[in-house]
């Protein structure tokens, strides 16, 4: 796991974990931004800010899904859009492609692949909390970071400190349902923008 800490300068300052969402983006490399602009001076002076790249993300041990040669072959493949001709066929194609990609990730990443999930990420946060000598975990989570925070709270309710969860995801929705809602929202915004420009 890759970890970065921005020190407040105070001795024995409490720790604030930051997760900007994703999943899939690095937090470690974004820590200077959060410390300089994103959190506000009062927060940066009061807390040591911790950025932790979850397993498979950013500077943590990566997940490999294919060799360079396999990636080149995949990227050079025929790019056809069959959705207009036969939507059901296109859905089946995407599902098969996703299954194939997951199988490649599993075979190229070994046992790590089976532990790339939100529960494992929450457990990793708890391990780092303990290593840093903190009785509770303080978290600022955005988007997917809210789901990670809710998962942590479900696993370790007695260790929840101060949580700010902004832009919360509905944990009862599937990834497909979240994506569909997001697409409808983006489309509505685009239609309003087009209307304003007319």
Locate the predicted segments by residue.
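Gly/Pro-rich cap/lid or specificity-loop segments adjacent to the active site
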Residues: 4-198
């Amino acid at each position: 796991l890759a970890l970065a800490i921005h020190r407040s300068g105070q001795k024995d300052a409490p720790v604030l974990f930051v997760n900007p969402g994703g999943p899939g983006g690095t937090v470690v490399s974004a820590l200077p931004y959060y410390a300089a602009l994103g959190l506000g001076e009062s927060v940066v002076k009061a807390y040591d800010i911790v950025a932790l790249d979850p397993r498979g993300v950013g500077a943590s041990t990566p997940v490999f899904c294919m060799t360079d040669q396999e990636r080149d072959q995949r990227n050079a493949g025929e790019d056809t859009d069959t959705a207009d001709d036969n939507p059901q066929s296109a859905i089946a194609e995407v599902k098969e492609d996703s299954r194939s990609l997951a199988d490649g990730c599993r075979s190229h990443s070994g046992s790590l692949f089976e532990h790339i999930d939100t529960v494992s990420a929450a457990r990793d946060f708890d391990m780092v909390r303990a290593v840093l000598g903190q009785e509770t975990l303080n978290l600022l989570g955005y988007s997917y970071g809210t789901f990670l925070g809710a998962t942590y709270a479900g696993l370790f309710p007695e260790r929840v400190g101060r949580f700010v969860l902004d832009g919360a995801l509905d944990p009862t929705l599937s990834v497909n349902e979240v994506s569909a809602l997001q697409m409808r929202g983006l489309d509505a915004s685009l239609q309003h923008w087009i209307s304003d420009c007319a």
